[in-house]
Amino acid sequence: MEGKGFTEEQEALVVKSWNEMKKNSQELGLKFFKKILEIAPAAQQLFSFLKDSTVPLEENPKLKPHAMAVFVMTCESAVQLRKAGKVTVRESNLKRLGATHFKAGVAAEHFEVTKLALLETIKEAVPEMWSPAMKNAWEEAHDQLAEAIKSEMKPSD
């Protein structure tokens, strides 16, 4: 997935905000997932470890590590976008992500939910840095990662 349209200014905004958020990535990852489920409660059914869970989200033993991994991967991918010229998630991981999302029944519109949740999480995490330009930078980075995952959303071989 080409890093077209991701400018030096956007890269600087993403890097600056990610450097600030990195130290709280576990907490922010959990916030990110809680926002996804607030926006789209039905999305809970897409996660095998949440589907039939009766414990509160914060107490689900599998949610924290998953949420942190997803948040970190999303942010790290955004930071590398301009330098690499494309989404840098390893191809094998991208294929696995695509297949997993496909198998779970994730639809294209679900990525709009993750974008809203990501933007809200970042806005709350670094309010003093937040600006329309930063919002645009993170939107662009999210959209390129989402497109890369969607392009691999097919049955696994």
UniProtKB/Swiss-Prot annotation:
Q: Which reaction does it catalyse?
A: Fe(III)-heme b-[protein] + nitric oxide + H2O = Fe(II)-heme b-[protein] + nitrite + 2 H(+)
Tell me which UniProt keywords the record has, alphabetically.
Answer: Cytoplasm, Heme, Iron, Metal-binding, Nucleus, Oxidoreductase, Oxygen transport, Transport
- Chief localization: cytoplasm
Q: Where is this site: Homodimerization?
A: 135
Compartments annotated for it: namely: Cytoplasm; Nucleus
The record's GO molecular-function terms, alphabetically, read: heme binding; metal ion binding; oxidoreductase activity; oxygen binding; oxygen carrier activity
The UniProt record describes its induction as: Moderately induced by waterlogging in roots, but down-regulated in leaves.
| One BP term from GO | response to flooding
Entry comment describing in which tissues the protein is expressed? Predominantly expressed in leaves, to a lower extent in roots, and barely in stems, flowers and seeds.
Domain (Globin) spans 5-154
Query: What cofactor does its activity depend on?
Result: heme b
Which CDD domains has this protein been placed in? Answer: class1_nsHb-like (cd14784)
Give me the comment on cofactor binding.
Binds 1 heme group per subunit.
Please name the InterPro entries in this protein's record.
Answer: Globin (IPR000971), Globin-like_sf (IPR009050), Globin/Proto (IPR012292), Leghaemoglobin-like (IPR001032), Leghaemoglobin_Fe_BS (IPR019824)
GO CC term, one of those recorded? nucleus
Task: Note the Pfam families from the entry.
Answer: Globin (PF00042)
State its role: Phytoglobin that reduces nitrite to nitric oxide (NO) under anoxic conditions (e.g. during flooding or in waterlogged soil) and upon root nodulation. Required for general plant development and during nodulation, especially for the onset of symbiosis. Monitors nitric oxide (NO) levels during early phase of the nitrogen-fixing symbiosis and buffers oxygen in functioning nodules. May not function as an oxygen storage or transport protein. Has an unusually high affinity for O(2) through a hexacoordinate heme iron because of a very low dissociation constant. Involved in water stress tolerance.
Q: Self-association or partners: how does it assemble?
A: Homodimer.
What's the name of the protein? Anaerobic nitrite reductase Hb1
